[in-house]
């Protein structure tokens, strides 16, 4: 779904303090020492719930979002949420993940910038973390999700589900905390990035960093319309080519006759020649 703005687009799509919370709930889960070094002195997590937890907490399902997702897995595009839930057709009463039966939890991942601590959050010095935000791993992210699980007093998830980068976190759960899940549902994911994925993503990173408005990652205080939108747009175009099938790409971008013209007619070629 495309998002339209009446004026220049905001410098960032991140949720920030003071924005409408929407359906988000928040919990502070303490400090974390990170796998690659460094630490975060306090981690706040934004999460949403759907359905009702039963008396013995046996009907809980955890949903893992992909790289650019958030906690809004289901629900309307209301205050605090620019779009409908990204799995809105799957989660709800009578749907595949039936909230008449299941209690569903989805949290914004560590570093995700949609309410959970990330580069757009305020650092202890009062500035946005921006370029100073430390590197985090899937292991760090799942550690925070495990703390959220403990906070919610859920002993074992009936299932954990996720696709893409979310699927990587599902796999991490299965490896690190197998006694805390009954089943794992991994969609379009892998235990590690392949060489071609690393190569493509390095090109995406270069596209973003080459945008002068990237400002080395410290662009949060810029005015509307002055963010790294061009670089991000190019990176997104790269991304669109990496998770589409050949058939779909042909439908979207394949050669096609223009304006109902017959490319084999004599008049078509005369017209095309004159226009050169």
Predicted regions and their residues:
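Alpha/beta-hydrolase
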Residues: 18, 198-276
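Catalytic-loop region of hydrolases
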Residues: 2-63, 77
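Alpha/beta-hydrolase-fold catalytic nucleophile elbow
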Residues: 107, 185-188, 241
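N-terminal cap/lid subdomain of alpha/beta-hydrolase-fold enzymes
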Residues: 48, 52-123
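A gly/proline- and charged-residue-enriched helix-loop-helix capping module
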Residues: 82-101, 137-139, 146, 151, ...
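Conserved hydrolase catalytic core segment
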Residues: 155-200
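A short beta-to-alpha transition loop/helix N-cap that caps and shapes the active-site region
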Residues: 71, 114-115, 190-202, 206-209
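Conserved acidic catalytic loop of the alpha/beta-hydrolase fold
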Residues: 126-132, 139-159, 178
């Amino acid at each position: 779904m495309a998002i339209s703005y009446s004026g220049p687009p905001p410098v960032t799509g991140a949720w920030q303090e003071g924005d409408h919370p929407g359906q988000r709930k928040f919990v502070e889960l303490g400090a974390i020492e990170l796998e690659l070094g460094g630490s975060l002195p306090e981690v706040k997590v934004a999460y949403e719930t759907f359905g009702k937890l039963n008396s013995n907490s046996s009907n809980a399902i955890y949903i893992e979002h992909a790289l650019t997702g958030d906690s809004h897995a289901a629900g309307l595009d209301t205050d605090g949420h620019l779009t409908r839930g990204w799995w809105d057709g799957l989660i709800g009463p009578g749907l595949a993940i039936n909230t008449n039966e299941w209690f569903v939890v989805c949290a914004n991942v560590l570093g995700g910038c949609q309410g959970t601590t990330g580069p757009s959050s305020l650092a202890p010095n009062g500035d946005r973390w921006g370029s100073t935000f430390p590197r985090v791993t899937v292991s760090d992210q799942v550690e925070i999700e495990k703390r959220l699980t403990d906070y919610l007093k859920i002993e074992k998830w009936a299932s954990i589900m996720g696709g893409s980068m979310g699927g990587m976190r599902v796999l991490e759960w299965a490896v690190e905390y197998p006694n805390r899940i009954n089943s794992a549902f991994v969609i379009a994911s892998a235990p590690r990035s392949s060489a071609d994925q690393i190569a493509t993503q390095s090109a995406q990173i270069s596209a973003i960093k080459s945008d002068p408005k990237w400002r080395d990652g410290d662009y949060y205080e810029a005015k509307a319309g002055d963010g790294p939108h061009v670089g991000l747009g190019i990176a997104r175009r790269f991304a669109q080519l990496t998770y589409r099938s050949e058939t779909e790409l042909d439908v979207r971008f394949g050669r096609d006759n223009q304006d109902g013209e017959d490319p084999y007619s004599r008049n078509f070629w005369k017209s095309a020649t004159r226009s050169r």
